[in-house]
Amino acid sequence: LMMLLPLAASAQGGGESVSKHFNMFVKHHTKILIDAAESMPADKYGYKPTAAQWTFGKIIAHMAGDNRITCSAIAGVAPDKSPEPSATASKEELVSALKGSLTFCEQAVAKVNDGMLAGSVTYYGQRATRVSPLIGLVEDWSDHYSQLAGYLRLNNVLPPTAKNGEM
């Protein structure tokens, strides 16, 4: 919710564009998500705090797959039909898949301007405004970064946003 406040403020005529704030969010989260994925030791990609939770690798695999769907909607193109990476793939394969999906998202969001936000796109098989997958992206990345940061801490690894007072 805190991530959406600048968006609401700019929509009230603050002078800055809403799409600029989405771009800032995507650039920042691309960096911290990649840093988080790279920070976890390869032998801990199978780690999960409880039996009911996903492994660290599953979260990375899920994000790589889900980003293709969400960012295809943002771009207004059909999603890539390739399957989500395996949760048991190597760290290198998972980080590579995540990086590729994040690059695709950066490119998709960079093409969006404020005039496009109310435009119609297909998002998970439904018609929606383009702002719907953008908000979904903010929500999803914030949720999963929080998971990754918790998993890192449980393995004595400092999360990227805890280093140098970064937020």
Regions found by a protein language model. Name each.
Residues 23-34, 44-83, 122-167:
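Short, contiguous alpha-helical
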Residues 41-45, 75, 110, 114-117:
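Short, flexible helix-adjacent loops and helix caps
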Residues 36, 88-122, 128-144:
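Acidic/histidine-rich alpha-helical segments that form the ligand environment
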Residues 39, 62-65, 100:
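Residues within well-ordered alpha-helical secondary structure of globular protein domains
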Residues 1-8:
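Bacterial N-terminal signal peptides
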